[in-house]
């Protein structure tokens, strides 16, 4: 086995946001040397990595030359140049997850076709090359209102997703490649994090339940374990494992799903990296998702995925009407609460609904944890000076 610890081994991370920063907690723990590439000079990772490089994640030469300096390359954001990654792979560089996996996941249309091809349950959909093509599809009754519109590229944290109820809603849409997806009448939005090592060892975390902000379409609460029947949880895990095996990914794969009114499980989308739905694991699990991702991409034994205690994550996002230098109002009040741990991401500027941090609540009783989470949400505010 290669010596990754206290050695000359170099791990490259594409993207220097909060996910990378939290991954660096564990590279520090194991004394793994890290190089990070990010376009922002104020990226959260900058203070915690060994070497920071400012540069575009979409520029071929920048990504290729960065990748040549390191031994293994991973990423914390999907919007990276896959052609540069593919060239590095051809030259023998280790890239996890692979450029092939990432290329499918980068495009929501390609992702949906992948599910169809691999008999993975997902909502019915149609692909459209532009807005005119979509309008034609509605006129020809190929798409029925209402439906969920998704941009095939670039959407995240609720961006690039709209509920379309009328022609007026269509008129407001950008002229981009998109998919029109059937509206699902669902009970719950669930997620399962699957981790797969280079050797093919696979483990899954418990099913989590996600509660969304009604306007921003962002996750407000992640609840582990999900408050669902065991048979539904078992179905969700099986579907997530099927998705993982189809992709043959290496590292973390977060699989977001719908639980329908009749308890079917439908895959919504996936993320091939540490994910918002797994942040609770830092305090609540035997092995957190960031350490687990490192273990997988370095082909080390995977850690236990069970929870030590129930956990709920509350996202901290910028308050409406506030843009500028950030202030975490009342943070000292939530720090007095038992089992409450805030995480601040290191973004200096706030704006409405921008993810600025999260808070984890741990408790033996998940219903009690949910009450505390509500109290946390109503106490702390992310505002500007």
Residue ranges of model-derived segments:
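Short, flexible turn/loop "capping" segments at secondary-structure junctions
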Residues: 45-46, 152-153, 350-354
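Peripheral (often C-terminal) accessory segments that flank ATP-dependent C-N-forming ligase machineries
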Residues: 7, 295-385
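Anion (oxyanion) recognition and catalysis
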Residues: 28, 89, 116, 143, ...
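Active-site nucleotide/adenylate-binding loops and adjacent lid/helix of ATP-dependent enzymes
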Residues: 104-191, 195-243, 377
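Phosphate-binding core of ATP-grasp and ATP-grasp-like enzymes
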Residues: 174-228, 233-267, 271-279, 294-304, ...
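ATP-binding N-terminal substructure of ATP-dependent carboxylate-amine bond-forming enzymes
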Residues: 1-106, 110, 132
């Amino acid at each position: 086995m290669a010596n990754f610890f206290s050695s000359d081994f170099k791990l490259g991370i594409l993207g220097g946001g909060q996910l990378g920063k939290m991954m660096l907690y564990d590279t520090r723990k194991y004394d793994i040397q890290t190089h990070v590439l990010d376009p922002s000079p104020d990226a959260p990772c900058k203070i915690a990595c060994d070497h920071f490089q400012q540069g575009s994640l979409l520029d071929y030469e920048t990504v290729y030359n960065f990748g040549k300096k390191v031994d293994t390359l991973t990423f914390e954001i999907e919007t990276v140049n896959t052609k540069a990654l593919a060239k590095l792979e051809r030259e023998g560089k280790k890239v996890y997850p692979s450029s092939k996996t990432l290329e499918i996941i980068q495009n929501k249309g390609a992702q949906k076709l992948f599910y169809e091809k691999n008999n993975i349950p997902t909502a019915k959909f149609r692909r459209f090359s532009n807005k005119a093509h979509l309008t034609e599809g509605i006129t020809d009754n190929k798409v029925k209102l209402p439906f969920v519109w998704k941009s095939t590229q670039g959407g995240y944290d609720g961006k690039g997703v709209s509920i379309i109820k009328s022609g007026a809603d269509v008129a407001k849409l950008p002229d981009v490649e998109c998919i029109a997806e059937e509206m699902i009448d669902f009970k719950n939005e669930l997620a399962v994090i699957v981790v797969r090592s280079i050797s093919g060892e696979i483990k899954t975390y418990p099913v989590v339940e996600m509660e969304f902000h009604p306007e921003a379409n962002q996750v407000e609460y992640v609840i582990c374990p999900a408050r669902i029947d065991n048979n539904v949880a078992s179905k969700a895990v099986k579907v997530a494992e099927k998705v993982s095996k189809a992709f043959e990914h290496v590292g973390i794969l977060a699989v977001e799903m719908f639980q329908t009114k009749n308890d079917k499980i439908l895959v919504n989308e996936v993320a091939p990296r540490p994910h918002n739905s797994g942040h609770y694991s830092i305090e609540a699990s035997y092995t957190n998702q960031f350490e687990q991702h490192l273990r997988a991409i370095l082909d080390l034994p995977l850690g236990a995925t069970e929870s030590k205690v129930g956990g709920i994550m509350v996202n901290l996002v910028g308050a409406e009407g506030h843009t500028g230098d950030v202030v975490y109002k009342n943070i000292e009040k939530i720090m007095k609460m038992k089992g409450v741990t805030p995480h601040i991401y290191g973004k200096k500027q706030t704006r409405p609904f921008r993810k600025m941090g999260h808070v984890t609540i741990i408790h033996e009783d998940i219903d009690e944890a949910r009450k505390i989470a509500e109290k946390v949400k109503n106490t702390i505010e992310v505002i500007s000076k």
